[in-house]
Design a protein with these regions (language model features):
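Sec-dependent N-terminal signal peptides
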Residues: 4-17
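Non-cytosolic coordination micro-motifs
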Residues: 20-51, 85-229
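N-terminal, post-signal-peptide region of Sec/Tat-exported proteins
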Residues: 42-82
Length: 229
């Protein structure tokens, strides 16, 4: 039991707990509510709405972009951001890697991949890989906020998970390598349980020989979950 408690406390120092009533935000705006209300809030941020195309345009993160508001059952669940101007293959790699570094250095995000390794190598032929192997270049993160940093109950959660997997004797006999592996496993489980509804991810897409980055700010709590089936 002592080792389980120590493990729980060690994880407590590095983990972040997430309240379920918090939702993903785009430029500080909660991704929730009606589409019309969201459009008005984005217009207040300086974006211009085109009713014919049902999209907004403006500048975001130093680039000209188009923005679409996506809903499910009249509730916003996604903000979709697209480059307004396409790039060459070489430039899109630079842009993608720069975006990866910006997310990595921003304390509002943690990578969904525990290692956070998303950048594209200099020698990567993305045109070939995408067209021949259907390779997808994507990076995904969980969004956090100061309000999320509530570790209440985390130690008990970690203890219950540990006791469900190991007996006290087995826990005492784990090697340090096994303990470290289990800590990573617990952290990933915790992130999936507490953060998966606050996903921000981006990918490269190709259209007519030009490359674009799509960014998705998702509130999975409002996403379709088969209720209409």
């Amino acid at each position: 039991m002592k080792r389980i408690l120590v493990l729980g406390m060690a994880l407590l120092l590095t983990a972040v707990a997430f309240a379920q009533n918090n939702v993903t935000r785009f430029m500080g705006i909660p991704i929730d509510g009606t589409k019309s209300a969201m459009i008005q809030k984005l217009k207040a941020k300086g974006f211009t709405y085109n009713a014919n195309e049902d999209e907004l345009s403006g500048e975001f993160n130093g680039k000209d972009v188009y923005i679409r508001v996506v809903t499910n059952r009249n509730k916003v669940y996604r903000i979709f951001v697209s480059d307004a101007v396409g790039s060459t293959e070489g430039n899109i790699k630079v842009n993608f890697n720069r975006l990866c570094r910006q997310f990595a250095q921003n304390d509002k995000y943690i990578p969904q991949n525990v290692f956070g390794e998303y950048e594209i190598g200099d020698d990567e032929d993305i045109s070939y890989e995408m067209s021949v192997h259907n390779k997808r270049y994507q990076a995904a993160y969980y969004q956090i906020s100061e309000a999320d940093k509530d570790t209440t109950g985390f130690t008990q959660w970690a203890i219950e998970k540990a006791m469900a997997k190991y007996t006290e004797e087995e826990m005492q006999n784990l090697t340090e390598q096994e303990v470290q592996h289990f800590k990573i496993e617990l952290l990933m489980d915790y992130m999936n349980e507490k953060m998966s509804h606050k996903s921000v991810w981006f990918m490269i897409t190709e259209r007519f020989g030009r490359y674009y980055i799509y960014i998705f700010y998702d509130n999975e709590l409002n996403h379709a979950n088969g209720e209409d089936l």
